[in-house]
């Protein structure tokens, strides 16, 4: 049986930390920032961690 391929789109969007958690960037933080307040745009530039079932699914997609 051939090797499983990793999902290339998921590999570009998610990173695995050293402790094994999945890190992702927030959406809505790249353009049209003039209508969003400073607190919101600052928060949108921070990355966040995935939790629960979604993290398991993404981990399987990345590892292939």
Curated annotation (Swiss-Prot):
Looking up Pfam families in the UniProt record yields:
Ribosomal_L35p
Answer yes or no on keyword Cell wall biogenesis/degradation: no
- Mind listing the UniProt keywords for this protein, alphabetically? Ribonucleoprotein, Ribosomal protein
Keyword Ribonucleoprotein tagged: yes
Q: Which GO terms describe its biological process?
A: translation
What terms describe the molecular function in GO for this protein? structural constituent of ribosome
Alphabetized InterPro entries for the sequence: Ribosomal_bL35, Ribosomal_bL35-like, Ribosomal_bL35_CS, Ribosomal_bL35_sf
Cellular component terms per the entry's GO annotation: cytosolic large ribosomal subunit
* Protein family membership: Belongs to the bacterial ribosomal protein bL35 family.
Q: What is this protein identified as?
A: Large ribosomal subunit protein bL35
| Record organism | Chlorobium chlorochromatii (strain CaD3)
The protein's gene is named: rpmI
């Amino acid at each position: 049986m051939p090797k499983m391929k990793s999902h290339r789109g998921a590999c570009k969007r998610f990173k695995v930390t050293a402790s094994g958690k999945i890190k992702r960037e927030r959406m809505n933080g790249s353009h049209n920032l003039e209508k969003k307040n400073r607190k919101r745009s600052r928060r949108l530039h921070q990355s966040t961690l995935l939790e629960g079932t979604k993290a398991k699914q993404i981990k399987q997609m990345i590892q292939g």
